[in-house]
């Protein structure tokens, strides 16, 4: 069952994010307090019925299997509103593709309901996992694949 993440779901979300971070050994610089602040702000905005924020969870037997955190921005090329997936975190001990699709289906309905048409999802996963994730979205939602580069300037 997909449901909106509420004030009382925060601890479950934090546990799943921490589990995902530990299991995947992401190579980005992590600042938990910044991410938690972003999450809490997004939940507050969603609680105000701000359609530019969406935080949803996929629950099976009242257990969080995955969550999606997204907010929108206005594209500087064409002034279109784009829903930007910030996090799609899945419990890797479960059916990943099934949960991803359920979360994205809900997001697509949310975008349509509020008059939107565009979305995007970047990934910080390792190359192989990023490609699988992107190809799933391409297959299911006819998404275009783009490439990006992330770098660090040395001292």
Each language-model region and where it sits:
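A short, internal acetyl-CoA/4′-phosphopantetheine-binding micro-motif in the GNAT/acyltransferase core
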Residues: 85-97
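Conserved GNAT-fold acetyl-CoA-binding loop/helix
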Residues: 21-42
